[in-house]
């Protein structure tokens, strides 16, 4: 897939190509992270760029999306490890980053607006917003192919602190996302 895109970009003299990657490509511990790492190496070899993003807040297939659908179906919630932390970005911020960096060739672009959330706070916020019975949830436990927190590409070079969202912040964000996404689909 990646090689085909690079071949076509070269054939049609595409000025820059930005491949979407993930923070899971830094010190990868599973197949997904390793495949993204290898894709990054190939893209950079051809002098194109990488957008090494973090989790998109409430993207399709994300933990929030899965939990939301389980709650709406009145199913049990499955949780891996409440002690995990994840970095997130809003889709609007990601789009801004991509547009603002379209001319930056042969570079790894990292998100400019990110925030950190503890999985326990995310879980508690969602069940509060949706009034879900916590007795219908269970913890699977930590899995070997997951990290407690991902490593960012420029972790050592951050010149700003990454805000950590508390439950109040998360509840506001969940309510806004529900209003913008799910209500607008009705």
How would you describe each model-predicted region?
Residues 11, 41-43, 47-50, 55, ...:
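Strand-loop microenvironment adjacent to phosphate/nucleotide-handling motifs in alpha/beta enzyme folds
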Residues 1, 30-31, 63, 122:
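Residues at alpha-helix caps and immediate loop-helix transition turns in enzyme cores, especially N-
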Residues 2-37, 48-49:
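Conserved Rossmann-fold NAD(P)-dependent oxidoreductase catalytic core, especially the SDR/UDP-sugar
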């Amino acid at each position: 897939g990646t090689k085909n895109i690079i071949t076509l970009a070269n054939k049609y003299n595409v000025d820059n190509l930005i491949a979407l990657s993930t923070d899971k490509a830094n010190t990868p511990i599973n197949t997904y992270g390793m495949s993204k790492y290898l894709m990054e190496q190939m893209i950079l070899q051809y002098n194109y760029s990488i957008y090494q993003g973090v989790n998109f807040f409430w993207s399709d297939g994300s933990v929030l999306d899965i939990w939301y659908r389980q709650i709406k179906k009145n199913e049990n919630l499955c949780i891996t490890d409440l002690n995990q932390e994840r970095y997130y970005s809003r889709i609007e911020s990601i789009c801004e980053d991509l547009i603002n960096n379209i001319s930056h060739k042969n570079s790894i672009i990292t998100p400019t607006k990110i925030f950190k959330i503890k999985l326990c706070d995310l879980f508690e916020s969602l069940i509060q917003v949706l009034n879900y019975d916590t007795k219908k949830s269970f913890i699977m436990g930590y899995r070997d192919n997951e990290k407690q927190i991902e490593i960012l590409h420029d972790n050592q070079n951050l010149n700003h602190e990454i805000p950590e969202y508390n439950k109040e912040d998360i509840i506001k964000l969940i309510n806004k996302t529900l209003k913008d996404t799910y209500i607008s689909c009705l």
